[in-house]
Curated annotation (Swiss-Prot):
Protein name: SsrA-binding protein
Function (record text): Required for rescue of stalled ribosomes mediated by trans-translation. Binds to transfer-messenger RNA (tmRNA), required for stable association of tmRNA with ribosomes. tmRNA and SmpB together mimic tRNA shape, replacing the anticodon stem-loop with SmpB. tmRNA is encoded by the ssrA gene; the 2 termini fold to resemble tRNA(Ala) and it encodes a 'tag peptide', a short internal open reading frame. During trans-translation Ala-aminoacylated tmRNA acts like a tRNA, entering the A-site of stalled ribosomes, displacing the stalled mRNA.
Region (Disordered): 131-160
One Gene Ontology term, aspect cellular component: cytosol
Family membership noted in the UniProt record: Belongs to the SmpB family.
Organism: Stutzerimonas stutzeri (strain A1501) (Pseudomonas stutzeri)
Length: 160
């Protein structure tokens, strides 16, 4: 079985599917409005961003489809909704860029990762353009050839 890559210490969750399905044009860092039980769950690493996206409406950005699994010990008096819509905190200039770009055909706004920055949880969102099927195959071929080159470089050093 292949070794799992270690995430950097501040990373809570990654959206690898977005990196596979989209060309990333521009990245933004956004704050999140969270409830207390959500922060506890994120400390435990119980988050998934696989089918999440960013919805832009009424001059605000919202994180949709992100799944934060509630802990069994947390939130006994509050009903925890794991896939609730969460508000993203961006400044007006960044929101303007996102609104303008998403209006263009083919652009989408997706969540790439959740991570800790000091004591706050941040969400990295990206302005992205969808990949076609042949683009995905081309990216996979490039990745395979890079892997072969790296393997050859490692074995070349050991032959000496």
């Amino acid at each position: 079985m292949a070794k799992q890559k270690k995430q950097s210490p501040g990373t809570i969750a990654l959206n690898k599917k977005a990196l596979h399905d989209y060309f990333i044009e521009q990245k933004f860092e956004a704050g999140l409005v969270l409830a207390g039980w959500e922060v506890k769950s994120l400390r435990a690493g119980k988050a998934q961003l696989v089918d999440s996206y960013v919805l832009l409406k009424d001059g605000e950005a919202w994180l949709m489809g992100a799944h934060i699994t509630p802990l069994t010990s947390a939130s006994t008096h509050v009903i925890a909704d794991p896939t609730r819509t969460r508000k993203l905190l961006l400044n007006k200039r960044e929101l303007g860029k996102l609104f303008g770009a998403v209006q263009q055909k083919g652009y989408a706004c997706v969540a790439l990762s959740l991570y800790w920055k000091k004591h706050m949880i941040k969400c990295e969102i990206a302005l992205a353009k969808g990949k076609k099927e042949f683009d995905k195959r081309h990216t996979e071929k490039e990745r395979d050839s890079d892997r072969e080159i790296q393997r050859a470089m490692r074995t070349k050093g050991k032959d000496d």
